[in-house]
UniProtKB/Swiss-Prot annotation:
Enzyme class, spelled out: hydrolase
Residues reported to bind Mg(2+): 8, 10, 212
Gene responsible for this protein: cof
Pfam families: Hydrolase_3 (PF08282)
Family annotation (Gene3D superfamilies): 3.30.1240.10, HAD superfamily/HAD-like
Keywords carried by this UniProt record: Hydrolase, Magnesium, Metal-binding
EC number: 3.6.1.-
Protein name: HMP-PP phosphatase
Entry-linked InterPro entries: Cof, HAD-like_sf, HAD-SF_hydro_IIB, HAD_sf, HMP-PP_phosphatase
């Protein structure tokens, strides 16, 4: 039986309205009753995740910023990785040929250069929001990650520009169809989960993980049991064809799967 369960948030544990369903919350509590350690592995900021955790009365480790930070149950930093300052400086100051909006993250919060109210819909559960600022004024040595939000085709073209400018100095990935992330080289949820597993005296084979986007690829591909959401990006399903696909986040598919796993561990699972 798995001893550590890792959950992506958006498109996985959260429903389409960005809330946690009652069944999901109850199932997470059942895992803790079985002494299974929980970790939420997300692109969201730790400041936001602490608020969400506080509403759940659950103990969980936090992997945030797509692996740039790991926090203990007590809130202590177990691991941190920032963007190379030269990479951050290049990304923040270059005039990219794109319509996408730029968003910069550091330990103090989420920063962007203009009001984009539509982006706040994903944060209604926590009330977390961006701070409008001149992005070029942010110290490059304090940046954890940078992301661009916009049309997918535009972001694909932007990724080509970023790859040419940054070469092998950063890790680029899509955390959603409309969100392209610039992360520290070698930084992803999978590498962070490996650090956490080692800290807990476990191996990745002792873990199960759930996700729906390309920023979940390394995590899902490295654990003992990786499970892909039915609403996942097609690229993720194609990249990990050997993994099982469960149901849709709107139907609380993670809870559905885990309830079956807890009650009938030796029987085959069907998402129907």
């Amino acid at each position: 039986m798995a001893r550590l369960a890792a959950f992506d948030m958006d498109g996985t544990l959260l429903m389409p309205d960005h809330h946690l369903g009652r069944e999901t919350i109850a199932t997470l509590a059942r895992l803790r009753e079985r002494d299974i350690t929980l970790t939420f592995a997300t692109g969201r900021h730790v400041l936001e995740m602490r608020h969400i955790l506080g509403t759940l009365s659950l103990d969980a480790y936090l992997i945030t910023g797509n692996g740039t930070r790991i926090h203990s149950l007590e809130g202590d930093v177990l691991h941190r990785q920032d963007l190379d300052p030269q990479v951050a400086d290049t990304v923040m100051h270059h005039a990219w040929d794109t319509r996408a909006s730029m968003h910069v993250f550091n330990d103090n919060g989420w920063f962007t250069g203009q009001e984009i109210p539509a982006l706040l819909q994903a944060h209604v559960y926590s009330g977390f929001r961006y701070q409008v600022i001149d992005i070029k004024s942010i110290p490059a040595h304090q940046v954890t990650k940078i992301c661009f939000c916009g049309d997918h085709d535009d972001l694909i073209r932007l990724r080509i520009q970023l790859n040419e400018a940054l070469e092998e100095r950063a890790h680029l990935c899509f955390s959603a169809v409309d969100c392209l992330e610039v992360l520290p080289l070698g930084c992803n949820k999978g590498s962070a989960l490996a650090v956490l597993s080692n800290h807990l005296g476990l191996s990745l084979a002792d873990c199960m993980a759930f996700g729906d986007a390309m920023n979940d690829r390394e995590m899902l591909g490295s654990v003992g049991r990786g499970l892909i959401m039915g609403n996942a990006m097609p690229q993720l399903i194609a990249a990990l064809p050997h993994l099982s696909v469960i149901g849709h986040c709107g139907n609380q598919a993670v809870s559905h799967f885990l309830t079956h796993w807890l009650d009938n561990p030796h029987l085959p699972y069907s998402p129907e």
